[in-house]
Structures are given as structure tokens and as C-alpha cells.
Amino acid sequence: MAEVLFASSAMRHGYTRQDFYEVLAGDYLKVRSQRGLEDVYELLGRNLDGAYLHVVYRILADRRLRVFHINRMSEAQRKRYQRHSK
């Protein structure tokens, strides 16, 4: 796995680095940025507590990942994730 950097903004909503790794360890959906940002991806998944999380990260030029957002999924994101998980 690539080295992962966490922006302070990633922790703004009370989630932690551990939550990010828990999403990666489970069943997640990876999509390109819904805002059309280059080299930015979104993960929809769950942590071990069962929270539905939305993670946004950028792939840096040196191939490291910079996570800058972790928060609960919106209702639309949750429905999309649940369709994927079936």
C-alpha cells in the first residue's frame, strides 16, 4: 500500500486514521471525484463500528495518498453504497 498522509481537515468531523484503514479493510466502493477533480477519488464504506463513511483523497505526484475528508455518507451516497454491496 502507498504511504498515506492525512490533512488536518480529514479529522474535522471526529473520525480518525483508524476509520480510514477500517474502510479499506472492508467492502468499499471507489469512485472518481464527483466534482470532477483530477487525481481525486472517493471511497464509500463502513468502519468496524458500522458507520457509513465517505472518504476523499488525492493521489499525489509521488504516488502517496493525501486523505483530506472523512465524514458520514449522505443519504444518496448510502443508497449507492448499499446497491453496490448487494
Residue spans for each PLM region:
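Ribonuclease/tRNase effector modules and their secretory precursors
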Residues: 1-86
